[in-house]
A protein has these predicted regions:
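A generic alpha-helix structural signal
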Residues: 15-16, 33, 59, 262, ...
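Conserved C-terminal alpha-helix-loop-beta "cap" of PLP-dependent enzymes
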Residues: 266-363
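N-terminal charge/polar-biased segments
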Residues: 1, 34, 43, 127, ...
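Short glycine-rich or small-residue beta-strand-to-loop segments that form or flank ligand, phosphate
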Residues: 16-18, 43-49, 83-87, 292, ...
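Short strand->helix junction
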Residues: 22, 144-146, 336-337
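Glycine-rich phosphate-binding segment of PLP-dependent enzymes
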Residues: 1-26, 32
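Conserved PLP-enzyme active-site core in the AAT-like
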Residues: 1-6, 30-48, 52-247, 257, ...
Length: 381
């Protein structure tokens, strides 16, 4: 919705520089592979148009191998191993369904366990029984996924290695890229435009033999997901800049914002509003402010607060993934200096309007979800 992170200056400079030149894309991708894999401490890397596109291309590559006839044949998977093994709790939605990203390649999904339950035994038994059909297994690292009674990423990789099944890790929103290769991931997928603040692109890294086959997809279904020279070069600079950053200073800045918000809310004492600082669910070095709304005390719903913050001018977008549980989060990431005060000023204005019923105060979860769908359907109307 908000165009990813704010692009860092060095990535912008890199894009502007290469815009003015012709390049050999194959050679540029080789440079990207060499420089990015060095940062990630793995064998190889390739840049794709997006992490979502990279997911589809990585699955495709596991079916085709280095057989160009197979590459040309997709999404027809005749005579290929075309099953992707994944925990049911990892078939989530990140704006689109993970399942759809897999199916776009022509592959079929082989899910195991329940939405909130999968053991090592269930995963391994499913793998063993279907080994002659499975091309790869996928693990999604995301706050969207259920990690309750799910198998761990380390166990997932160990089981895959035991049965010689390639592993794909979807870690689009993670900041510790090298950790996945340290524990043995064959391929991992990252976003260049999230934490690293580069141009929109996917970064796929891992074992050289798999990365080479991913690159071959540009001759097939990957053609519709091709990446430009500017995103490739900006991703190189974005990754290298990420590993040079002063992360201690970043954490200090985040904590200052959180402290300001906590002090502001403590002074205002909004009726029915409670709050707490929470850590990032997947272990990134980020803390966020979680806002709870008690409708009986506040006389408005949390869905109403979120909706009107977004429709406000200036718009305030919150992390509303778990709003059905009666809370949302305020994120410190990427805020420019002084914007933390704007967030609280507008927060106060919207609450006042909700309390006076100047704006709709009783939006429920169903209405909230439907409003978003209607806006998509009414685009350009």
């Amino acid at each position: 919705k908000i165009g990813a992170s704010i692009t860092n200056k060095k990535s912008i400079e890199a894009a502007n520089k290469i815009f003015q030149n012709f390049v050999n894309i194959d050679e540029l991708q080789k440079i990207a592979s060499k420089r990015i894999s060095k940062c990630f401490k793995t064998e190889s890397a390739v840049i794709t148009a997006s992490a979502a596109g990279g997911l589809t291309e990585s699955v495709a590559s596991m079916m085709t191998g280095n057989n160009l006839d197979n590459v040309y044949q997709l999404p027809n998977t005749k005579n290929m191993k075309d099953r992707v093994l994944i925990q049911k709790g990892h078939l989530t939605n990140y704006g689109a369904e993970v399942s759809q990203g897999i199916l776009l390649s022509g592959a079929k999904i082989l899910s195991c366990g329940l939405k909130k339950y999968c053991t090592n035994e269930i995963f391994e038994n499913t793998l063993s029984k279907n080994k002659n059909k499975i091309s790869c297994a996928m693990y999604v690292v995301s706050h969207h996924c259920s990690d309750y009674n799910a198998i761990s990423i380390s166990d997932f990789i160990k089981i895959c290695k035991k049965h010689k099944i390639p592993s794909i890790i979807d870690a689009a929103s993670e900041e510790y890229m090298e950790d996945f290769f340290r524990i043995g991931a064959d391929v991992a997928i990252f976003s260049a435009h999230k934490f690293m603040g580069s141009l929109t692109a996917g970064i796929l890294a891992g074992k050289k033999k798999y990365i080479k086959n991913i690159y071959l997809q540009n001759l097939g279904i990957g053609r519709g997901m091709k990446v430009g020279k500017e995103a490739i070069y900006a991703a190189i600079i974005g990754v290298e800049n990420w590993y040079k950053r002063d992360w201690k200073k970043e954490i200090e800045n985040q904590n200052k914002i959180l402290k300001y918000w906590l002090n502001y809310l403590s002074k205002e004492r909004f009726n029915g509003i409670t709050y707490e600082v929470i850590a990032d669910p997947t272990g990134n070095k980020i803390n966020r402010l979680r806002i709870h709304v008690d409708q009986k005390k506040s006389n408005f719903t949390i869905q109403s607060l979120s909706y009107h913050l977004e429709k406000n001018k200036p718009a305030i977008f919150v992390r509303d993934d778990l709003i059905h549980l009666n809370h949302f989060e305020l994120d410190t990431c990427n805020l420019k200096k002084g914007q933390e005060t704007i967030v609280m000023t507008e927060f106060k204005k919207i609450i006042a309007k909700l309390k006076s019923k100047e704006i709709k105060h009783n939006i429920n979860q169903k209405e909230y979800s439907n409003k978003s769908k209607k806006e998509w359907l009414n685009w350009l109307n």
